[in-house]
Amino acid sequence: MKTQVGMWIDHREANIVFLSPAGERTRQIKSNVEKQLRRSGDSPSRERYETQMVPVSDQRDRGYMRHLANYYEEVFLAAHGADTVFIFGPGEAKGELRKQFQKRHFSERIVGFEPADKMTPRQVSEKVRNFYRTTPAILLRNGD
C-alpha cells in the first residue's frame, strides 16, 4: 500500500488524512487569515488621477492573497510526498491548492477532486477512508 492522502480544505483550515501501511494519521493546518471586510472609507477615489492611486483595500487584498499563497504552500508541502491525493471542500480553496500541485508538476497525483460542505475532522477521515476503499485500483495508479 502506498501513502494516500485526502484533505478537506477551505480558506481557514485544511484537515489532512494520511493513510499508509503504518496506519492513519491526521494533521490540521490553520491559515490564520480572515478576509477583511471593505470599510465605507475604502472605496476608490473618483479624483482626476485616481488610476495612479492604489486604494487601501487593494493593498489589504494583496496581503491577504500573499498570506493565502503561503497557506497553500504549507498544505502542499504536507501532502506532496503522497502517492495519491484526494482534495475536497467548499469554495475556491481546493482549486487554488490544485494550482499549487499543477505548478509543481504533481497534478497527476490528484485522483479525486470534489465539492464538500463543512465537515468535522472525524467526517473528513471517514470520507477519505471510504474514497480510497471504493475507488477502483486502476484509477489510483500513477504511472506504475
Where are each of the predicted segments found?
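Terminal alpha-helical anchor/extension segments at protein ends
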Residues: 1-144
